[in-house]
Amino acid sequence: MKEYQTITEISGPLVFVETDEPVGYDDIVEIELSDGETRRGQVLESASDYVAIQVFEGTEGIDRDASVRFLGETMKMPVTEDLLGRVMDGTGQPIDGGPEIVPDERRDIVGEAINPFSREYPEEFIQTGVSAIDGMNTLVRGQKLPIFSASGLPHNDLALQIARQATVPEEEDGEDDEGSEFAVIFGAMGITAEEANEFMDDFERTGALERSVVFMNLADDPAVERTITPRLALTTAEYLAFEKDYHVLVILTDMTNYCEALREIGAAREEVPGRRGYPGYMYTDLAQLYERAGRIEGREGSVTQLPILTMPGDDDTHPIPDLTGYITEGQIYIDRDLNSQGIQPPINVLPSLSRLMDDGIGEGLTRADHADVKDQIFAAYAEGEDLRDLVNIVGREALSELDNKYLDFADRFEEEFVDQGTDTARSIDETLELGWDLLSMLPKDALNRIDEDLIEEHYREDETAETVEA
């Protein structure tokens, strides 16, 4: 450990120190102020004669007489199964007043991408209890499926709903008591104090905290801390998944705040900016986070990611959602129009996509009719959406009887299937049965994407009769 008192410049969250020998990139630093206070930081840039340090607690009050100690190691997360039920700040320090954490080991937070040769293809279903996801855009264990939202939309409510409702089928059915434990890692970045209180109230009220580890980085915390929080969360998830055989769902919100922190740090370092001022390495940086999801051959556990981001200006071509879409395996869209109609959660299934869905559904996974029901609902709802535009021109009276049924289907799909509130958890059977109720509004010959045997087994004749009477 070497100590310096050679601070040359303090700029925003950065402290620049003259050194007489090279210092390792990402090394942890302690800065001792004249009043004895100690702050932690991390080496952000290292040259032969100086280093740039990002200070986690902020640089206010630091002067040139402060002592800087380089600890010679990168940041590590103390991990143990006892982290479940605990609440940490954005740097991994407990803030819940609980006992001191006694770690089983300390792990480097940067982590490593899973060796492609050792990856197992994601195939098992995760039940979120949300019909628009489970039925139409299924989440699969080991997948990374982002939620694209926008300012003012209830993505936090959806995140909390998934955190308390998510299960794996084998855990729910009790078929396999070993290797099927389910845990949630919740990493919040740049949230307000009000949002933090809302999160904690919900976790404690519903009992979801018992199977969760929560990391909270607040809006008034230093931006550099936001770059640490998701790595702490993922390091904890990897330990629980690959050492303790948990199926871990990692919810990260809001990745836009994370990227804004990257931009702020890049500006402080006077880096050459990329698109819209974001650093040119943002794609690589995001990939380092998202690629930590997956399954490893020979291990029971899995890491599944559900990152949430708000699209600036509702623009899905903005660099943050654009780059996220390249790396991840689909997206769930939160829709402003559906939200204005009072539909909760306001998920628009048409632009949403789960690229791994087809491998995680079907007989032995969800139900044999799942894929056909999903395809037919997509087709019918898309037809109803197109007809809504036509109705604005010619009116409903000019449409055929079948066209009017498609319009009614689209309305009921939003009101009954998508709109389930934030406190209702539906099983996959309930979701698919509701899908059949809606599809039975249409005549059998319109169900051209479903196997005839499945139609005979599940079609409700009474639904068609009720529609005709109406």
UniProtKB/Swiss-Prot annotation:
CDD domains in the record: ATP-synt_V_A-type_beta_C, ATP-synt_V_A-type_beta_N, V_A-ATPase_B
Keyword entries, A-Z: ATP synthesis, Cell membrane, Hydrogen ion transport, Ion transport, Membrane, Transport
Coiled coil (UniProt feature): none
Any single Gene Ontology cellular-component annotation: plasma membrane
Keyword check for Membrane: yes
Membrane topology label: Peripheral membrane protein
This protein's record includes keyword Cell membrane: yes
PROSITE patterns: ATPASE_ALPHA_BETA
GO molecular function per UniProt: ATP binding; proton-transporting ATP synthase activity, rotational mechanism
An annotated GO BP: proton motive force-driven plasma membrane ATP synthesis
Tree of life domain: Archaea
Subcellular location: Cell membrane
Subunit structure: Has multiple subunits with at least A(3), B(3), C, D, E, F, H, I and proteolipid K(x).
Stored PANTHER family: V-TYPE PROTON ATPASE SUBUNIT B
Function: Component of the A-type ATP synthase that produces ATP from ADP in the presence of a proton gradient across the membrane. The B chain is a regulatory subunit.
Family statement drawn from the similarity comment of this UniProt entry: Belongs to the ATPase alpha/beta chains family.
Name of the protein described by the UniProt record: A-type ATP synthase subunit B
Species, as recorded: Haloarcula marismortui (strain ATCC 43049 / DSM 3752 / JCM 8966 / VKM B-1809) (Halobacterium marismortui)
